[in-house]
């Protein structure tokens, strides 16, 4: 084997080990993002009360709990995604839809992991990358649309008269909203990494095909040529000598 071929083989083995390790980490963080997506969709802790709010309570995408404002901290909870009429704002409905779509996309991406056993690795990486990018986009839309519903009467009763669109008044942002923003960054990084892994797999496949073609040509030529340089099957033909007869 030529030195260049040995170097190429070593590079290929080294890259395959590293790509498998990176791919495993990518899959683990994809599952983590899916968990984040499910949590931020279900949990009602997107915005909540503070020490100066007229009433205690907290709001999510579709589920919310608000107190009466009297002594005690008893909360009345309402809202269900299956019953849109219980959601206090159309902006909340739209935000819930986009976050749900993001959750469906990332769960579909995890389902596509099974394709690694049947399809080309580069193709699967690129499919997952697009799904993660779309999931991030849907989550961005959900986070941007959600504050548009802060002027709903139910939220104004809890957060005070200063509350309006994109203004929480006396209320504050809770951990689920922050977790959704972290999830967006996570999804964008995962999508970029999947595109890189997919493109590298494509380049590696092309290099392997080129190397196989070179090896095939070299093997064919070496099998045709003899060690001494003669072409196999072509013997040295005797030179015909003209015999002249005497007078």
Swiss-Prot record:
GO CC terms, sorted: dendrite; GABA-ergic synapse; inhibitory synapse; postsynaptic membrane; postsynaptic specialization
InterPro entries found in the cross-reference section: LHFPL (IPR019372)
Residues spanning the membrane: 22-42, 97-117, 127-147, 178-198
Membrane topology: Multi-pass membrane protein
MF GO annotations: GABA receptor binding
Function: Plays a role in the regulation of inhibitory synapse formation and function by being involved in maintening gamma-aminobutyric acid receptors (GABAARs) clustering and their associated scaffold proteins at inhibitory synaptic sites. Acts in concert with NLGN2 to recruit or stabilize GABAARs.
Similarity field: Belongs to the LHFP family.
PANTHER family xrefs: LHFPL TETRASPAN SUBFAMILY MEMBER 4 PROTEIN (PTHR12489:SF14), LIPOMA HMGIC FUSION PARTNER-LIKE PROTEIN (PTHR12489)
Name this protein carries in UniProt: LHFPL tetraspan subfamily member 4 protein
């Amino acid at each position: 084997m030529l030195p260049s071929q040995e170097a190429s083989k070593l590079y290929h083995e080294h890259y395959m080990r590293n790509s498998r390790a990176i791919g495993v980490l990518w899959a683990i963080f994809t599952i983590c993002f899916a968990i984040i997506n499910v949590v931020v969709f279900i949990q009602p802790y997107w915005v909540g009360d503070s020490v100066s709010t007229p009433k205690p309570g907290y709001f999510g995408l579709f589920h919310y709990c608000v107190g009466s404002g009297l002594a005690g901290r008893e909360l009345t909870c309402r809202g269900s995604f299956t019953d849109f009429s219980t959601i206090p704002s159309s902006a909340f409905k739209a935000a819930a839809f986009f976050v749900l779509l993001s959750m469906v996309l990332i769960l579909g991406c995890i389902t596509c992991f099974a394709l690694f056993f049947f399809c080309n690795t580069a193709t699967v990486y690129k499919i997952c990358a697009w799904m993660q990018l779309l999931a991030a986009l849907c989550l961005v839309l959900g986070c941007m649309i959600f504050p548009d519903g802060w002027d709903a009467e139910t939220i104004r009763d809890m957060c005070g008269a200063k509350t309006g669109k994109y203004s929480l008044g006396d209320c504050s942002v809770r951990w689920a909203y922050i977790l959704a923003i972290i999830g967006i960054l996570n999804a964008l990084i995962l999508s970029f990494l999947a595109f890189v892994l997919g493109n590298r797999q494509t380049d590696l496949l092309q290099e392997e095909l080129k190397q196989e073609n070179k090896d095939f040509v070299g093997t064919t030529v070496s099998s045709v040529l003899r060690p001494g340089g003669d072409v196999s099957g072509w013997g040295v033909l005797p030179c015909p000598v003209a015999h002249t007869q005497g007078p």
